[in-house]
Regions:
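Small-residue-rich hydrophobic transmembrane alpha-helices
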Residues: 48-108, 145-164, 271-335, 369-391
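Short runs within selected transmembrane alpha-helices of multi-pass transporters and secretion channels
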Residues: 69, 138-156, 164-172, 193-206, ...
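Short alpha-helical transmembrane segments in multi-pass integral membrane proteins
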Residues: 1-18, 76-141, 185-241, 297-364, ...
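Hydrophobic transmembrane alpha-helices of multi-pass small-molecule transporters
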Residues: 60-63, 175-180, 205-209, 281-284, ...
Length: 459
């Protein structure tokens, strides 16, 4: 069930590890896409805008959860690469305690503050009630988000990227069926979409946990290994919190953008919702390459093979460029068909035109987006998650400037430039940070090797 990524051809290893991740991410996007498509087609444009108005707030909180789980898995991957099984199990146990604690706190706080948050976002009056209901139920499912993402992050850290995919295929199907039943048959509207998402996440998390317990013998723990350890929790938090905060900081820029976009009206919100969902779907492959690099870099750091990390990054560049070109071509010829999944292209002509423009400008910058994802996840896998978090600050600043300066002047075109500007700003920070991180670690490994040689000579 486990897989060692410290030997073999880097391109082949990363590609084979990425493919299940990509399919898994696609199916995870189907949770959101199913809600959006069914709501947009069967309830109406206002309902589509209702779901879309919650997008940045949703990512703000759930991005923190997912980022933190991925961060907790980095030391686990490093320990697996170093073949330190007992300490690995202690880290898994303490990651479990941390997830339980954070899950309870975040659920209580976010559910209690749902309505004030949507008011602060200047959500249009005609959709604020539905938006508050939808995001409130999504926040109620935070424990299930923790459960699935922590279990799947552990599996990936141990080299298994296929198993989480199988569970997501099943639960995505459940999500779509529940969407259709609750929204169409029971007329539950956006509430039905939220409930379907929560139930699907719960199924995915529970099944994944049962599988992890039964199949991964390396994780069979003693009572002593289950004990809370302050030092272990500190190490896990040192990786998890910066990765969670990186997603949150990036999302803060998105929240500010959403605030500015909401002021342009519900039609603009609907256009960006449809275009944004499409972009998220297409960028899944890039995120998957990055996620693969985090595990690959972590295991190879544990094995003291930084030369393989450099080779892995170069291999990832090739994948990013090839995919970005194909995605741009696909969008160029199929954008109307894709938007037609969300909207009636015959009656919502103006909204469709805005969505097409938004997708065009974003797809032009998929290569820098892919590069920043590779650098960010590699830096995280090497244990320098605070550096990666700083790139989120660059993205946030870029989006904030556009929201406060360009959108009031350029209107919708300013919103179209927000993601490309944020991606370029992050690249300007991340590339030098990646070079420094690898060089710094190489020097540390060399110094340690020379010290060992000196000690051996002295003996």
């Amino acid at each position: 069930m486990t897989k060692d990524l410290t030997s073999g051809n880097p391109f082949k290893i990363i590609l084979l590890f990425t493919l299940p991740l990509m399919l898994g991410n696609l199916f995870q996007q189907f949770y959101s896409l199913a809600d959006t498509i069914i709501v947009g087609r069967f309830v109406g444009v206002n309902a589509l805008a209702t779901v879309g108005a919650t997008g940045s707030v949703n990512y703000l909180i759930l991005g923190f959860v997912i980022g933190m789980c991925n961060g907790f898995a980095i030391p686990i991957a490093q320990l697996f690469g170093a073949h330190d099984d007992s300490d690995l199990r202690r880290h898994v146990a303490n990651a479990t305690w941390l997830c339980i604690a954070w899950g309870v706190v975040l659920t209580v706080v976010t559910v209690a503050l749902t309505r004030p948050i949507m008011e602060l976002m200047q959500t249009p009056a005609d959709i604020i009630d539905g938006a508050s209901t939808y995001i409130g139920w999504i926040f109620a499912g935070i424990p299930f988000v923790f459960l699935y993402n922590m279990v799947s992050a552990i599996m990936r850290a141990l080299g298994d990227s296929k198993t989480p995919l199988y569970f997501l295929v099943l639960t995505s199907a459940v999500n779509i069926v529940l969407d259709l039943v609750l929204i169409i048959n029971f007329n539950m509207g956006v509430l039905g979409a939220a409930v379907a998402t929560d139930v699907s996440q719960a199924i995915s998390g529970v099944i994944s946990l049962i599988y992890l317990i039964k199949k991964f013998k390396i994780l069979h723990m003693t009572r002593d290994e289950w004990k809370y350890s302050r030092s272990t929790c500190r190490r896990l938090s040192a990786m998890g919190l910066p990765m969670g905060l990186q997603c949150t900081i990036t999302a803060v820029g998105g929240v500010i953008m959403q605030w500015a976009v909401n002021g342009l009206g519900s039609s603009v919100v609907a256009a960006i919702t449809a275009a944004g969902k499409t972009q998220n779907l297409l960028s899944c492959a890039l995120e998957s390459i990055g996620t693969a690099m985090a595990t690959y870099a972590g295991q190879n750091l544990g094995a003291a093979r930084l030369d393989r990390v450099r080779s892995g990054v170069k291999s990832s560049y090739i994948m990013v460029v090839a995919y970005s070109v194909l995605a741009f071509i696909a969008l160029h010829f199929g954008d109307v068909v894709i938007i037609g999944l969300f909207l009636d292209t015959k009656t919502e002509v103006e909204i469709v035109a805005m969505a097409r423009d938004y997708m065009f400008w974003n797809s032009l910058f998929f290569i820098p987006l892919g590069a920043l994802i590779v650098w960010r996840y590699t830096i995280q896998g090497l244990g320098y998650s605070t550096l990666a978090m700083m790139a989120g600050v660059a993205e946030m600043v870029a989006r904030t400037v556009i929201a406060l300066v360009l959108i009031p002047v350029l209107g919708y075109f300013g919103a179209e430039l927000s993601n490309p500007a944020a991606w370029v700003a992050a690249c300007l920070f991340l590339y030098p940070a990646y070079l420094w991180t690898v060089k710094h670690l190489e020097n540390r490994l060399l110094a340690g090797h020379l010290a060992m040689q000196h000690s051996a000579v002295g003996d």
